[in-house]
Design a protein with these regions (language model features):
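Single conserved hydrophobic/aromatic residue that forms the stacking wall/gate
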Residues: 1-12
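Long, charged amphipathic helices and adjacent flexible linkers at domain junctions
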Residues: 10-22
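Active-site-proximal loop/helix of nucleotide/amide-processing enzymes and allied scaffolds
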Residues: 23-26, 58-145, 150
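Short loop/turn motifs at secondary-structure junctions and domain boundaries
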Residues: 33-36
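Short beta-strand scaffold segments in enzyme catalytic cores
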Residues: 40-44, 49, 121-124
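Acidic, metal-coordinating catalytic segment for phosphate/diphosphate chemistry
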Residues: 154
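Non-Sec secretion/translocation targeting segments of pathogen effectors
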Residues: 161-169
Length: 169
């Protein structure tokens, strides 16, 4: 399913290029409507990191959400994306990845990797904060040659903006 009508407008989507985890969190946060239960979304993007579609995956109870990996895979392929960012919320306010979050992310990376779709990040939003699994080295890369996950360090984001340079006087 595509994100419900509270989603973001097509004009806005065409104008934004998501370059880092913070931009993804700001972009996706408006879709989270129920502060009492976990909700799970996926931002499907093209090679230029421009969102093609926000895809609603599932909602659950206050401390967990279950989802269908096959549905997630079908929706990602149907969007014709080349990469995605996963996003879910933690109503508890804990801005950290649980073991279940890490295992689910790995399963999704394996499934999407088999069809050539890269998972750039899995962000967790709380009412006041956010957590990027990629920025904490928790998003392995899919190796198409072996069909396995590579847990070696990887660049957090392909388009991370340069840090501002100090002007010397």
């Amino acid at each position: 399913d595509v994100a419900p009508s509270r989603g973001l407008g097509d004009v806005y989507k065409r104008q934004v290029q998501l370059r880092n985890a913070e931009m993804c969190c700001e972009y996706i946060r408006p879709l989270f409507s129920d502060p009492k239960r976990e909700e799970f979304y996926m931002i499907a993007m093209n090679d230029d990191y421009v969102p093609l579609k926000e895809i609603y995956i599932a909602s659950g109870i206050p401390n967990r959400v279950q989802f269908d990996t096959h549905k997630l895979l079908r929706d990602a392929v149907a969007s014709q994306c080349t990469c995605v960012v996963l996003a879910h919320n933690h109503p508890s306010g804990l801005a950290a990845a649980s073991n279940a979050d890490l295992l689910a992310t790995q399963a999704i990376i394996l499934a999407l990797g088999q069809v050539g779709i890269d998972v750039l990040d899995h962000v967790i939003l709380t009412p006041t904060n956010w957590f990027s699994m990629a920025e904490h080295g928790r998003v392995p890369q899919y190796n198409p040659g072996t069909g396995q996950l590579l847990f070696a360090a990887r660049a957090t984001w392909p388009m991370e903006p340069e840090k501002p340079k100090q002007i010397k006087r």
